[in-house]
Swiss-Prot record:
Protein name per its UniProtKB record: Lipoprotein signal peptidase
Biological role stated in the UniProt entry: This protein specifically catalyzes the removal of signal peptides from prolipoproteins.
Active-site residues (renumbered): D111, D129
GO BP annotation list: proteolysis
Length: 154
């Protein structure tokens, strides 16, 4: 059940950082954190990652509720005793709920983390997005390690 604590921590950190941005920054305002690389940039997104399907909130409500239900079911049924698997699901669940809260309460998601690599500006994201990404990477590691164990590869 420790993985639900991870989920709650992700949600709390996500909502706290978004609240700080909303309270202290104007939309479009940019604060340089690491020169030439990391900025806090206040942005609102009414779509999915990278503004995909902007303006289709009903779709995100439906998909998110279904995904959250599936993740909780999988956590209860299959994740017990599988540490990396349960942690990856906890990050994914926390990220999904964090952005869902924004969509329900504000019909948009607060994004603020902007990274720059040379001339490339990575799409602005938030803690929930980062948690989703970390969860997916951990899930891929779990699948790779589990596959190697199943095949007896060291």
């Amino acid at each position: 059940m420790y993985y639900y604590l991870i989920t709650l921590a992700v949600i709390a950190l996500d909502q706290l950082t978004k609240w700080i941005v909303v309270q202290n920054m104007e939309i479009g305002q940019k604060i340089e954190v690491i020169p030439g690389f990391l900025y806090w940039t206040s942005y609102r997104n009414d779509g999915a990652a990278w503004s995909i399907l902007e303006g289709h909130m009903w779709f995100f409500y439906l998909i998110t509720v279904v995904v959250i239900g599936i993740i909780i079911y999988i956590m209860q049924k299959y994740a017990k005793g599988k540490r990396l698997f349960s942690i990856s699901l906890a990050f994914i669940l926390g990220g999904a709920i964090g952005n869902f809260i924004d969509r329900v309460l504000h019909q948009e998601v607060v994004d603020f983390v902007q990274t720059v690599w040379g001339n490339y500006y990575f799409p602005i994201f938030n803690v929930a997005d980062a948690a989703l990404s970390v969860g997916v990477v951990l899930m891929l590691v779990y699948v790779f390690v589990d596959d190697r164990k199943t095949k007896g590869i060291k």
